[in-house]
Amino acid sequence: MARSITMQQRIEFGDCDPAGIVWFPNYHRWLDAASRNYFIKCGLPPWRQTVVERGIVGTPIVSCNASFVCTASYDDVLTIETCIKEWRRKSFVQRHSVSRTTPGGDVQLVMRADEIRVFAMNDGERLRAIEVPADYIELCS
C-alpha cells in the first residue's frame, strides 16, 4: 500500500470568489504545498539542500487532472491526503484527495487530483527530468 501523508488547510475569506466558494486556482496552490509536505514528512531534504547536494531543483508538474466533487467555503478546514500512486522511471503520479468534515461529522470528498511530476535538474539551459532516485522511492514507500 502506498504511504499516505495528510495536512490540513483552513480556508480564509480571501481564498474565495464573490460567490463565497474557493477560487479553483487556490486548490492547485494547496496541492503543491501538500506535495512538498509529503516529501518532507517522508524524510527528503528541502529543495534548497537537494539542489546543492544533487542538483535536483524540485518536482515540477508535467500534467494535472483534477475533478471537483463539491464546493468548499471560508472557515472550512480541508484535509489533503497525498500519496504516490505510481513510480515510473523518470516520473511519478502523485494523488491528492481533498475532503472536509461536515457539521454532522461526515467526511465529504471535495476534489481529487492526479499530478504527473518529475524530479528535475537545471542543465544550464533548461530543466530536464532525471531518473527518480531509488533512495527517494525507498523513503516514500
Curated annotation (Swiss-Prot):
UniProt entry tagged with the keyword Lipid metabolism: no
Annotated effect of mutating residue 32 to S: Substrate turnover rate is decreased
First-tier enzyme category under EC: hydrolase
Molecular function terms, GO-annotated: 4-hydroxybenzoyl-CoA thioesterase activity
Effect of mutating residue 17 to S: Drastically reduces catalytic activity
Pfam family, one: 4HBT_2
Gene3D superfamilies: Hotdog Thioesterase
Catalyzed reactions: 4-hydroxybenzoyl-CoA + H2O = 4-hydroxybenzoate + CoA + H(+)
EC number(s) stated in the UniProt entry for this protein: 3.1.2.23
UniProt-reported outcome of changing residue 89 to L: No significant effect on catalytic activity or substrate binding
Keywords, sorted A to Z: Hydrolase
Regulation: Unaffected by EDTA, Mg(2+), Mn(2+), Fe(2+), Ca(2+), Co(2+) and Zn(2+).
Keyword Hydrolase: yes
Record: residues binding substrate: 47, 59-61, 90
Coiled coil regions in record: none
Active site, UniProt feature: 17
Pathway of action: Xenobiotic degradation; 4-chlorobenzoate degradation; 4-hydroxybenzoate from 4-chlorobenzoate: step 3/3
Record note on quaternary structure: Homotetramer.
Task performed by this protein: Hydrolyzes 4-hydroxybenzoate-CoA, and to a lesser extent benzoyl-CoA and 4-chlorobenzoate-CoA. Not active against aliphatic acyl-CoA thioesters, including palmitoyl-CoA, hexanoyl-CoA and acetyl-CoA.
Family named by the database record: Belongs to the 4-hydroxybenzoyl-CoA thioesterase family.
UniProt-recorded name of the protein: 4-hydroxybenzoyl-CoA thioesterase
